[in-house]
Amino acid sequence: MNINEILKKLINKSDLEINEAEELAKAIIRGEVPEILVSAILVALRMKGESKNEIVGFARAMRELAIKIDVPNAIDTAGTGGDGLGTVNVSTASAILLSLVNPVAKHGNRAVSGKSGSADVLEALGYNIIVPPERAKELVNKTNFVFLFAQYYHPAMKNVANVRKTLGIRTIFNILGPLTNPANAKYQLMGVFSKDHLDLLSKSAYELDFNKIILVYGEPGIDEVSPIGNTFMKIVSKRGIEEVKLNVTDFGISPIPIEKLIVNSAEDSAIKIVRAFLGKDEHVAEFIKINTAVALFALDRVGDFREGYEYADHLIEKSLDKLNEIISMNGDVTKLKTIVVKSSG
């Protein structure tokens, strides 16, 4: 592969074919491309605008080079992040509820733009985020839940970490995380940081062999189901792509004040989640339930979103016991108990 020719193509705003993008991504991730050229390619892709074929090619390369585990019929709730509002880690909380009814392979990382990433909040709850593949399979078998830390399961990504940090801008790698689950999760609720990216990412997801993935962008600009207004979504299945607009009132609830969902740290997020599980924070509980409702719809466990909300309302009653089971199997229960005490006031 001639990297300089690829760069010229991108500078001329020509899209790469899937196989070109895949081979390019493999070369970059393996560390075979000089950093100065990696920087140029990532910036050229961003300036041109990443195409569907490029996202699919890069995603396939990342999947191939990842440490893989087999979790049949798993669901993931990973989103792109990057909304900048710093809301509570609702996708992680939803993953805990979902593990009551389905295997969950939660792919995630530390915070990039927010105050708390999924890895950060799980650590705050006492979870051991470094889980080797054999242990991961054991945890899924016993608890229906495992966290797959992106930095651990995509070790070759260290070869581009310095370039990404130095550039300090969003690159194609920022939007690949949710599409590169090491367990090859066939079901997903995927938050998207920009409404403009819904169409592109849904078309990319359609090429990546999901059974069903629902991509969401919520008002006022979050990569979650909206707590205050409309959620714009793309439902991607083997049958094609369906566009849906959902309002928070469609769940049968009133809008949730966004300021009640903001967190200052991973511990703050952990406390809010546990308070919701204890029945002491109605606003966060509602936020968790509406996101869980859409994930349940992705799993075809419910016929519509209102039914999903009612199911989630039932599941949240068992959520603290489930969280305790998850931490007991792979973490520090004393740390969780400390969070529970702080949440009980």
Curated annotation (Swiss-Prot):
- Provide GO CC annotations from the record: cytosol
GO terms assigned for molecular function: anthranilate phosphoribosyltransferase activity; magnesium ion binding
Positions that bind 5-phospho-alpha-D-ribose 1-diphosphate: 77-79, 82-83, 87, 89-92, 106-114, 118
Q: Does the keyword Magnesium apply?
A: yes
Sites binding Mg(2+) 2 sit at: D223, E224
Bound cofactor: record note:
Binds 2 magnesium ions per monomer.
Indicate which residues the UniProt annotation says bind anthranilate 2.
Answer: R164
**Keywords per UniProt:** Amino-acid biosynthesis, Aromatic amino acid biosynthesis, Glycosyltransferase, Magnesium, Metal-binding, Transferase, Tryptophan biosynthesis
**Catalysis performed (reactions):** N-(5-phospho-beta-D-ribosyl)anthranilate + diphosphate = 5-phospho-alpha-D-ribose 1-diphosphate + anthranilate
Q: Pathway, according to UniProt?
A: Amino-acid biosynthesis; L-tryptophan biosynthesis; L-tryptophan from chorismate: step 2/5
EC supergroup of this enzyme:
transferase
Residues engaged in binding anthranilate 1: G79, N109
Protein residues bound to Mg(2+) 1: S91, E224
Q: What GO terms describe the biological role, i.e. biological process, of this protein?
A: L-tryptophan biosynthetic process
**Keyword Metal-binding included in the entry's annotation:** yes
Q: What is its EC number?
A: 2.4.2.18
Chain segments annotated as coiled-coil in the UniProt record: none
Cofactor(s) needed, names only, are:
Mg(2+)
Function according to Swiss-Prot or TrEMBL: Catalyzes the transfer of the phosphoribosyl group of 5-phosphorylribose-1-pyrophosphate (PRPP) to anthranilate to yield N-(5'-phosphoribosyl)-anthranilate (PRA).
Please give the PANTHER family that the UniProt record associates with this protein.
ANTHRANILATE PHOSPHORIBOSYLTRANSFERASE (PTHR43285:SF2)
Subunit organization: Homodimer.
Give the family per the record: Belongs to the anthranilate phosphoribosyltransferase family.
This one is known as: Anthranilate phosphoribosyltransferase
Recorded source organism is Saccharolobus solfataricus (strain ATCC 35092 / DSM 1617 / JCM 11322 / P2)
| Organism ancestry | Archaea, Thermoproteota, Thermoprotei, Sulfolobales, Sulfolobaceae
